[in-house]
Design a protein with these regions (language model features):
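Active-site histidine-acidic residue metal-binding/catalytic motifs
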Residues: 33-40, 44
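Active-site beta->alpha N-cap acidic-glycine motif
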Residues: 16, 38, 56
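Active-site-adjacent mobile loop/cap segments within catalytic or ligand-binding domains
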Residues: 148-150, 176-224
Length: 224
């Protein structure tokens, strides 16, 4: 493996499955890409894996950046094809935010017994907080009807720049409350540019890459 590519165990799931990340490049600007926060959204995992493979084969393409790709944040949910982790927690409601709430409108949104209770969330919180490796941007791949590029924190212009390449609608509100979300934690409270990139459900990886690759490259190079 190249000196500019490092495979990391950033943590473990509830069932002790390693959560793997790949750091590509040693540049000063740090950018994170996540897939599989929700295990029943395989389209985002496939896109993150495709991106990881592309960047590893073209590691000099963005030599001034430090890119971290975590394709499967929720490996237990991904294996079980469930939104939640092995304890039934929606990881995107478990981040330690000021707006965290113990209430859930449906079981699929269960936020856990307390904020940051889940090992998968703890791994991402630790990764985001690494000294001298704090990301300037975070792109989290999901899948939803309708497709959209949702933003939190100082990411509106970034989202709009990405949308120029595929026409995905840009939204500042996903349409329903998301207390304890990654966007609230990293975007609104940590002032990191966070994009939740929502692919159409059941899209093939070939079509997802066709629609998304240039938008992703723009996100990497965009100066926000």
């Amino acid at each position: 493996m190249s000196k500019t590519i490092t495979e990391l165990e950033i943590g473990f799931s509830v069932l002790k499955v390693p959560i793997l990340g790949w750091q590509i490049g040693n540049g000063t600007e740090v950018i994170h890409f996540y897939g599989g926060v929700h295990g029943d959204e395989p389209e985002g995992v496939e896109l993150a894996l495709k991106l990881k493979d592309f960047l590893m084969k073209n590691s000099g393409m963005f030599s001034d950046k430090s890119l971290m790709v975590v394709p499967v944040v929720n490996p237990d949910g991904y294996s079980a094809k469930t939104r939640v982790n092995a304890r039934g927690v929606d990881l995107n409601r478990n981040f330690p935010t000021k707006d965290w709430s113990a209430e859930a409108t449906q079981a699929r949104y269960y936020p856990g017994p307390k904020p940051n209770s889940e090992p998968e969330v703890q791994a991402i919180v630790k990764l985001i907080g690494r000294r001298e490796k704090i990301p300037k941007k975070i792109i989290s791949f999901h899948s939803l009807i309708p497709r959209q590029i949702n933003y939190d924190g100082p990411a509106k212009e970034l989202a709009e720049a990405m949308a120029q390449y595929n026409g995905y609608p840009v939204t500042g509100n996903i349409g329903y409350p998301t207390p304890g979300s990654l966007g609230s934690y990293a975007g609104k409270e940590k002032n990191i540019a966070v994009v939740t990139y929502e692919l159409p459900e059941k899209i093939s990886i070939q079509e997802a890459w066709k629609q998304s690759s240039e938008a992703i490259f723009e996100a990497i190079q965009f100066d926000n």
